[in-house]
Design a protein with these regions (language model features):
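Non-catalytic ligand/cofactor/substrate-binding and regulatory segments of enzyme domains
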Residues: 2-152, 185-230
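Active-site nucleophilic cysteine motif
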Residues: 47-49, 146-178
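Aromatic sugar-binding interfaces of carbohydrate-active proteins
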Residues: 175-184, 188
């Protein structure tokens, strides 16, 4: 009787996208933090702006939430929650650059399924809102969400971070130590926000930028810088 053959092993290249996804992260999550700027009329815009970009082999979307509709409050701190979904990143960043604002892109490498999960999070927000078809262009779709905007949140920073956390749950771990409204807001503004309960989490773009620059709990792939004064 022939002797039994020893076990043989060989490496087989997978054709299963899910297996490839688990082994080779190839998507990017970018937290885009825009700095303050001075408008052409001399008005100072000191609060900055945050948006979230999800880039994979199948899509490249930038989620840009802000006070792009009716506003209210003493300082215009609340209003309609408008989400702009850009399918053309260059069109988005061109608009930011036109303000002579510097935008820092904090880039994280993620798996495709993480990017899809974050994309689905925003899809649910859009589903619960209303598309403003009159504002749609070849580069962007615009939606009025069911939840209004407020300076303390939901705002551009908190919504971007919430979306990022779907993909990277610990991306804001430790950020509460950088929640320092006094770095940006004057006394009157801080008192007005305190009357609304104060900030329970990091909500200002400048504070987010400092946190990601100094204490990001997740390793950055790189940091890109867009725009600035020419």
């Amino acid at each position: 009787m022939a002797a039994p053959k020893p076990f043989e092993t060989k490496t087989v290249e997978s054709t299963n996208p899910l297996v490839e996804d688990k082994l080779n992260p190839s998507s990017e999550l970018q937290l885009l933090v825009g700095g303050p700027y001075i408008a052409a009329d001399g008005e100072e815009h000191k609060y900055g702006h945050t948006a979230l970009r999800l880039k994979s082999k199948n899509f490249d979307l930038t989620y840009d939430f802000g006070r792009y509709g009716k506003t209210s409050g003493i300082f215009g701190e609340s209003g309609e929650g408008i989400l702009r979904v850009w399918i053309d990143f260059q069109a988005y960043i061109k608009g930011e650059n036109s303000l002579k604002r510097t935008t820092a892109a904090f880039v994280y490498l993620i798996f495709d399924h993480q990017a899809i999960a974050a994309k689905n999070y925003f899809a649910q927000l859009v589903k619960g809102g209303k598309e403003l078809t009159g504002k749609k262009t070849a580069s962007v779709s615009v939606y009025k969400l069911a939840t209004d905007y407020h300076a303390l949140g939901p705002n551009c920073t908190t919504l971007s971070v919430d979306g990022a956390k779907i993909a990277i749950p610990k991306i804001d771990y430790g950020s509460e130590k950088f929640n320092r409204p006094e770095d940006v807001l004057d006394l009157k503004e801080r008192l007005a926000l305190s009357a609304n309960g104060g900030a329970k989490r990091l909500f200002l773009p400048a504070n987010l930028q400092k946190f990601l620059s100094m204490a990001s709990p997740i390793r950055l792939l790189r940091t890109d810088v867009h725009g600035g004064k020419k």
